[in-house]
Amino acid sequence: MTELFIDGAWRDGAGPVFASRNPGTGEPVWEGAGASADDVERAVASARRAFAAWSALDLDARCAIVKRFAALLVERKEALATMIGRETGKPLWEARTEVASMAAKVDVSIAAYHERTGERRSPTADGVAVLRHRPHGVVAVFGPYNFPGHLPNGHIVPALIAGNTVVFKPSELAPGVARATVEIWRDAGLPAGVLNLVQGEKDTGVALANHRQIDGLFFTGSSDTGTLLHRQFGGRPEIVLALEMGGNNPLVVADVEDIDAAVHHAIQSAFLSAGQRCTCARRILVPRGAFGDRFLERFADVASRITADVYDADPQPFMGAVISARAASRLVAAQAKLLELGAAPIIEMRQRDPALGFVNASILDVTPVRELPDEEHFGPLAQIVRYTDLDDAIARANDTAFGLSAGLLADDETVWNTFRRTIRAGIVNWNRPTNGASSAAPFGGAGRSGNHRPSAYYAADYCAYPMASVESAQLQMPANLSPGLHF
C-alpha cells in the first residue's frame, strides 16, 4: 500500500509491514509498509526543499491554508471520528469531540502566533528596534495514540503557521488516523513537501530522531521515551526539543457538601478515555474519617457500573477499550504489583478477553503501601491514598517527579488558595476534573512531565525563534563619536 506521504505524493514504504487493529473487536484497520531509513531521508530532504518557499509565503496565505484544513475537518468530522474510534477503541461520542477540538485549535494557534510571536517595533533615539520571529526549518513531529488526530496537530498547526516544514511520525498504533488527517491537509492545498508522513515502528522513529538535517523535534508521548530523546539531544543545543509527557497526577478530595458532584469529577478525572489521558488522575487523595468513607463507598458504587463497549455501540458507553490487548495486560500486571506491595482492592481490574483491550474501571487503596512506585499507569486504574489534613494531602500530592496536572475538590476557597500556592503542577484545577484544560491556556507540566507548552496557546513559543534588530532607514554618521575615534 502507498502509505507514506512524501513530496506531495503517496508512496510505498520500504520498511517492514505492520498493522493496526480495533482493540475492541480485533478486526484489522490498517496495514502497510513502514518507512525505511532511506524513506526518512527522502522525507526530510523534501521538507528541506519546501522550506524556503513555504517560509517566504505571506503569513495570511499560510493561515488561509490552515483555516481551510479546519473547515475540511468540520466537513469530514464523522468520517475522521469513525477512523479514530475504530483504531483507538474510544467511543464515537469522544472521537467526535477530538475532531471538533482539532478544528477549534486552529483559530487559537493563529491568535497565539500574532500575540506571542509576530512582529513588534519600538522607536529608539537613532532608529527603531524591531522584534521578528523566524521559523526553525524542518521539524519532526512525533504523535501519540491516545489522541492521534488532536495532539499531533497541536504541534503541526503552529509549526506550519510559523513557516516550518514538517516530517510527521505518528504512533504505530494509529497509522490510519494519521493517513486520514494528512489527506485532509493535502486537500486543503498544502504545497508539496511542507508536510511529510513517515509511518513505521521504532526503527522509523529512531531514523527520524537521529537525522542530522532536522532543526527541531516536537514530541507527545510517554515520559520514558521523552527522557530518552532528551538524553539523545544532550550536547546539541541547535535542536529545539519540545516534550509533552505523562504524569502521576493527584486529585485531592476535601470534605464537600455535594458528594455526588465530587464523585462525578473523580470518575471523570480517573476514567475518562479509559484513563488514557496524560492528565487523568492516577492518585485520588481522600480524607480519613466518616466523610472519606462515604465518598469511597459512592465512588466505588458508580465506578462499578461504568460500561465499556465497542466504539460504535448503541447506546454509547462511557469507556471503550484501551489501545491494545497488550496494554490491557500491562495494566493488570501493574495492579498485581501494587497488590503484592500491600494495596487493598476495592474494585479489581480484569481483562475481559486476552485478545482484546477491554478492562474495567478499577480502584485500589494504596495507603498501606510503604514505598508507592512513582509511575504512570496509562489506563483506568485509580489509586486511593487516605490523608489526615491538608498539609498531609499536599505533601503526598507533591511526592512525585512528575508535575502535569492536579486538582482539588473543596467548598472552602481558603483551602483552594493554599492548594494552588503549594502544589507543583502545570495544570491545577479547582472543582473541575484534572483532565479539563482550556484551549486558550498553556498545556503542559513541570518535572518529568516535560518542557514547553504544546497543543495550544504557548505552542507558538517553540515554533519560531526571536530575531532582534536595530534599524535605521538612512546610513549616517552619529552626532557624537566614541572617545578615541577621529575622522
From Swiss-Prot:
Q: What is its EC number?
A: 1.2.1.71
Task: Name the PROSITE patterns on file.
Answer: ALDEHYDE_DEHYDR_CYS (PS00070), ALDEHYDE_DEHYDR_GLU (PS00687)
InterPro entries annotated for this entry? Ald_DH/histidinol_DH, Ald_DH_C, Ald_DH_CS_CYS, Ald_DH_CS_GLU, Ald_DH_N, Aldehyde_DH_dom, SuccinylGlu_semiald_DH_AstD
What's the superkingdom here?
Bacteria
Top EC class for this record: oxidoreductase
Q: What's in the keyword line of the UniProt record?
A: Arginine metabolism, NAD, Oxidoreductase
What catalytic activity is recorded? N-succinyl-L-glutamate 5-semialdehyde + NAD(+) + H2O = N-succinyl-L-glutamate + NADH + 2 H(+)
Name the source organism: Burkholderia mallei (strain ATCC 23344)
Keyword Oxidoreductase listed? The answer is yes
Classification of source organism: Bacteria, Pseudomonadati, Pseudomonadota, Betaproteobacteria, Burkholderiales
* One Pfam family linked to the record: Aldedh
Q: What is this protein called?
A: N-succinylglutamate 5-semialdehyde dehydrogenase
Q: In which pathway does it act?
A: Amino-acid degradation; L-arginine degradation via AST pathway; L-glutamate and succinate from L-arginine: step 4/5
Gene symbol here is astD
The record's Gene Ontology biological-process terms are: arginine catabolic process to glutamate; arginine catabolic process to succinate
| Disulfide topology | none
Its function, per the record, reads: Catalyzes the NAD-dependent reduction of succinylglutamate semialdehyde into succinylglutamate.
Q: GO MF terms on file?
A: succinylglutamate-semialdehyde dehydrogenase activity
Instruction: Name the catalytic site residues.
Output: 244, 278
- Family membership: Belongs to the aldehyde dehydrogenase family. AstD subfamily.
CDD domains reported for this sequence: ALDH_SGSD_AstD
* Residue numbers binding NAD(+): 221-226
